[in-house]
Amino acid sequence: MGVTKKPDLNDPVSRAKLAKGMGHNYYGEPAWPNDLLYIFPIVILGTIACIAGLAVLEPSMIGEPANPFATPLEILPEWYFYPVFQILRTVPNKLLGVLLMASVPAGLLTVPFLENVNKFQNPFRRPVATTVFLIGTVVAIWLGIGAALPIDRSLTLGLF
């Protein structure tokens, strides 16, 4: 970082320029073109060079090497697919499970039409959208936690 020149408020000429709104042109260092054309690209290229250098000099494994002859007991998807996986795992009819998954975006598309006359931005003045959001969040968290548990405890989360 460089040191910028501050205005001298004891100087009457500087005070007159600042009073007219002209002071910003006469002190300091402008951001254009110095910072944006010269300093920022060097910082960005230096960061990329450091990351590339570390990747070449110290490569790290992404995960355990795959063993095609040993499969895990239970295959789990990535964490962001847990609620969908739980729906498919607990619903006995697979077509019903797929329809339940498709109903989530369809239900979210109907929320703006339920409150189309309500123009408030405050969530407390839009009760339908707030309720749908809160219930959807609780259900998604419930399903996500349940997907990580065994099937017999997945719906109750082992609490009941």
Curated annotation (Swiss-Prot):
Membrane topology of this protein: Multi-pass membrane protein
InterPro entries attached to this UniProt entry: Cyt_b/b6_C, Cyt_b/b6_C_sf, Cyt_b6/f_cplx_suIV, Cytochrome_b_C_euk/bac
Compartments where found: Plastid, Chloroplast thylakoid membrane
GO BP term, example: mitochondrial electron transport, ubiquinol to cytochrome c
Lineage top rank: taxon: Eukaryota
Entry keyword Membrane: yes
Gene Ontology cellular component annotations, sorted alphabetically: chloroplast thylakoid membrane; mitochondrion
Transmembrane residue ranges: 36-56, 95-115, 131-151
Primary site of residence: plastid
Keywords: Chloroplast, Electron transport, Membrane, Photosynthesis, Plastid, Thylakoid, Transmembrane, Transmembrane helix, Transport
A GO molecular-function annotation: electron transporter, transferring electrons within cytochrome b6/f complex of photosystem II activity
The keyword Transmembrane helix is assigned to this record: yes
Pfam families for this protein: Cytochrom_B_C
HAMAP family: Cytb6_f_subIV
Family that this chain belongs to: Belongs to the cytochrome b family. PetD subfamily.
Subunit-level organization: The 4 large subunits of the cytochrome b6-f complex are cytochrome b6, subunit IV (17 kDa polypeptide, petD), cytochrome f and the Rieske protein, while the 4 small subunits are petG, petL, petM and petN. The complex functions as a dimer.
Function: Component of the cytochrome b6-f complex, which mediates electron transfer between photosystem II (PSII) and photosystem I (PSI), cyclic electron flow around PSI, and state transitions.
Protein name: Cytochrome b6-f complex subunit 4
UniProt organism field: Psilotum nudum (Whisk fern)
